[in-house]
């Protein structure tokens, strides 16, 4: 079976896609298996504090186990990544490390690069346009993910730096599959999302961009996970 590796947002677990969207219906219509992952507030990282190997579990152990249990294809043409919010970062991290393993990636209000988003907005894109809502949101994110991430500025140049990894992998001759990226103008991550969509395009990534109305919520994800699966056909 073709398979969609689907990551949820911060503070959630693997059941949320099934509970808050119609992903089971959409997957049945598309004839695709879906493997949902959720790692609470870990940013899908092997954490800085504590020995919690969330990214290793997601990207190494989970595929090995589920392919042992179920007849899921290993053909890159049959493998797809997607994520909401923090799950967007986890999906991107997997995608930039192993671009040859996937046909595409879908991000729905997906966090694009943690080390360029804080902690004090000093690294944030479009600083002149930052609103009080953005300031509050970044402060909340810093607190929520601090035990996993540590100081986000220390991630620059590591495997957790998505922009840096794209440049590094391209220099090594890696080819990246196409990307579907959607963000709503009412989203609290809108400035970040718009900036990174344009940045990844400038780095040579083929991006199908959607900027429409919608907030950082499951209603938006439900709409765009369906659009993403339709886009794959």
Which ranges hold each PLM region?
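Non-catalytic cap/lid and distal C-terminal segments of serine-dependent acyl enzymes
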Residues: 1-233
């Amino acid at each position: 079976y073709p398979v969609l590796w689907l990551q949820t947002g911060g503070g959630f677990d693997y059941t949320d896609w099934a509970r808050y969207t119609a992903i089971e219906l959409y997957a049945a219509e598309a004839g695709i298996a879906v493997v949902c992952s959720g790692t609470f507030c870990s940013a899908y990282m092997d954490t800085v504090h504590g020995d919690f190997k969330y990214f290793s579990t997601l990207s190494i152990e989970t595929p090995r186990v589920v392919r042992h249990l179920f007849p899921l294809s290993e053909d890159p043409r049959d493998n797809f990544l997607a994520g909401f919010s923090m799950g967007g970062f986890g999906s991107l991290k997997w995608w930039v490390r192993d671009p040859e393993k996937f046909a595409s990636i879908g991000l729905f209000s997906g966090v694009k690069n943690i080390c360029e988003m804080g902690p004090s907005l000093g690294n944030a894109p479009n600083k002149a346009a930052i609103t009080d809502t953005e300031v509050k949101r970044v402060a909340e994110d810093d607190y929520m993910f601090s035990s996993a991430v540590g100081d986000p500025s220390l991630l620059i140049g590591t495997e957790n730096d998505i922009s840096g990894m794209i440049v590094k992998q391209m220099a090594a001759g890696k080819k990246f599959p196409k990307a579907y990226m959607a963000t709503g103008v009412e989203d609290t991550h809108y400035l970040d999302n718009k900036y990174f969509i344009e940045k990844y395009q400038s780095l040579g990534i083929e991006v199908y961009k959607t900027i429409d109305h919608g907030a950082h919520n499951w209603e938006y994800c439900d709409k765009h996970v369906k659009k993403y699966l339709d886009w794959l056909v």
